């Protein structure tokens, strides 16, 4: 029915209503292209985006490879907690 693997992934994502999980990491990876962050002040301003990109990647890995629901929930909660903590520390550092 679908011609390419990308089309299968795209239509499967629409069916699950999680299309943002497909496009959001790709958007953040474009923002993190070398040479884009050429100044250290700009690096600190984009630090939350880098942390969000890392959090999305770790969440996908945990959802794919950990099959025990309680451990999966604990790890995902820990990642979100650490993400919020690190972003708040970064904001306090900028003040």
UniProtKB/Swiss-Prot annotation:
Signal peptide: none annotated. The keyword Ribosomal protein does not apply. Residues 41 are mitochondrial intermembrane. The heme is bound between the two transmembrane subunits. Part of an enzyme complex containing four subunits: a flavoprotein, an iron-sulfur protein, plus two membrane-anchoring proteins. The gene is SDH4. This is Succinate dehydrogenase membrane anchor subunit. Heme binds at residue 53. It is found in: Mitochondrion inner membrane. The chain crosses the membrane at residues 20-40, 42-62, 75-95. Pathway: Carbohydrate metabolism; tricarboxylic acid cycle. GO terms for cellular component: mitochondrial inner membrane. GO terms for molecular function: metal ion binding. A ubiquinone binds at residue 65. Keywords: Electron transport, Heme, Iron, Membrane, Metal-binding, Mitochondrion, Mitochondrion inner membrane, Transmembrane, Transmembrane helix, Transport, Tricarboxylic acid cycle. The keyword Electron transport applies. Its cofactor is heme. GO terms for biological process: tricarboxylic acid cycle. Residues 1-19, 63-74 are mitochondrial matrix.
